[in-house]
Amino acid sequence: MRKIPNHGTLRMTKVAYPLGLCVGLFIYVAYIKWHRASAAQAFFTIAGAASGVRWTQQAFSSPDSATRGHEVFYGIMFDAGSTGTRIHVFQFARPPGETPTLTHETFKALKPGLSAYADDVEKSAQGIQELLNVAKQHIPYDFWKATPLVLKATAGLRLLPGEKAQKLLQKVKEVFKASPFLVGDDCVSIMNGTDEGVSAWITVNFLTGSLKTPGSSSVGMLDLGGGSTQITFLPRVEGTLQASPPGHLTALQMFNRTFKLYSYSYLGLGLMSARLAILGGVEGKPAEDDKELVSPCLSPRFRGKWEHAEVTYRISGQKAVGLYELCASRVSEVLRNKVHRTEEAQHVDFYAFSYYYDLAASFGLIDAEKGGSLVVGDFEIAAKYVCRTLETQPPSSPFACMDLTYISLLLHEFGFPGDKVLKLARKIDNVETSWALGAIFHYIDSLKRQKVPAL
């Protein structure tokens, strides 16, 4: 039987419906305003935390599940290295009444590096824009205006003539200014080597939890890039501080604490620059009369071309007895009197990144995906084996003997004995182990000091 409607109820519905619609609309508008305000407030929240609040790091999880009910904010860091440009999009969350946590990182890399566009600046904008699109895809629209956007260039641009480097940076700045993110006048810069090392040290100690508690043991950082190499650690021995040469110590203020770090960057001792020096070439200059560069560190049967910093070199190996010894002798000449050795370094736990990892993984010294630990002597053993079998078992890379020998002797110059254990990792808790995370801390802290409002 069909139910007969109650007309009194119908009259009430006619009144209640528009009233409910208005109330619902009011609540929706209020929510949108609050949501946008929370995005702007995120800038102040993270800046304040970077200056004085202890940060914590939690296990990686999906952005949605990790941030429900928390304040959410983001930071974007471009790493313009010598061999490629990389974007890091960091997501942070602050639970009510607690300190912020890192909840997600998006990472993407493009090759070649910015320095490859030194004579065609307009082309550099294409890759930057492509990476910016990655940030837009992973950051909600409402947070764009409150998200700091920064690019820091490293050794690749430091090695370029000043005018060329500045033109590239200006083009990137133009692209950044046209983006919807939070962009300051200092959003694009060339990072000095010490800052690079310190920022990487912050990253690894943050991710390992060493920065959470005052007095806890920290770890050291070794990074081997294409154009430069860095070593950074926190000395515990007063003699280390007193014996350090000028420019090897830097003070870092973070989390209401002051860290006096031993940190130095050796420009020209990155793996690619070292290759050129070992071959007898000069940075940025073609060989005279297109002369072939011959080295005992290359396979005796190898003859080919190698491009570095936009210059192509003709290179070849040489037939000789005792190739490892000859190669090691040449590498030692390149490193002679260029690296400061500190006694304390051998007693500090170190993480090693970048080409240290890549070479170790390539020759089976660590798991290519998970990383792992090895002793410094493993590089020497691998170098001797590869160099002594160059003629009978040529490796897939013509530079294998050279690179392994260089890394082995570089670590020796730093003062590490053969039985010193190093930890090699690309990621810690799924976060890229680069200087990018540490650098974004520094940048946000500087914004707070300048009292820059979120847009």
Curated annotation (Swiss-Prot):
Lumenal side: 33-455
Enzyme nomenclature, EC number: 3.6.1.6
TM stretches of this protein: 13-32
Pfam families according to UniProt: GDA1_CD39
GO process terms (BP): response to calcium ion; response to magnesium ion
Topology Cytoplasmic: residue spans: 1-12
GO terms assigned for molecular function: CDP phosphatase activity; GDP phosphatase activity; guanosine-5'-triphosphate,3'-diphosphate diphosphatase activity; IDP phosphatase activity; nucleoside diphosphate phosphatase activity; ribonucleoside triphosphate phosphatase activity; UDP phosphatase activity
GO cellular component assignments: cell surface; extracellular region; extracellular space; Golgi apparatus; Golgi membrane; plasma membrane
Family named by the database record: Belongs to the GDA1/CD39 NTPase family.
Name by which UniProt lists this protein: Ectonucleoside triphosphate diphosphohydrolase 6
Organism: Rattus norvegicus (Rat)
Lineage: Eukaryota, Metazoa, Chordata, Craniata, Vertebrata
Gene name of the encoded protein: Entpd6
